[in-house]
């Protein structure tokens, strides 16, 4: 699974490898409630928007595209995930427990999650290698878990679509527009404000 995740992620990131172990742990915990993994629909919540997302996607098949992986439900930036049965909403949250990481024995691992790594005096690749090596000595020893009931809709509502009167493209009506009297997509709104994400050059 680590090899698959690394191939998908394209770089040897500590967070990705640690995430693989976290997902594996959460799946094992779920097996205690639901021994047959094919008997229910697995969903996931990710509390951060970095490497852990890819660990979840490659190991569970819960992706942003199929909406089995929820990213917007929680925006707290904690390195944690929840795997749960969509029908019962019951599952497990696995998270990094900093109290279990000895700062003296595993300085790079602690610094990685505390965001205190010294990038000025070391190369990022070297720090990542040291972090991974320290993690492999403790593995699940730095995780804690909680049994949880997830309070989000089992399925996302179908968002209405509109046709932008400026660019002519259809778009999902997700947020309140700046000018509710006109059907203008978010990109064209930002373009009018000269704050667009990209500029068409040809």
Language-model-detected regions and their locations in the chain:
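Long, charged N-terminal interaction/targeting segments
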Residues: 3, 7-152
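Cys/His-clustered metal-coordination modules, chiefly Zn-binding fingers
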Residues: 114, 120-202
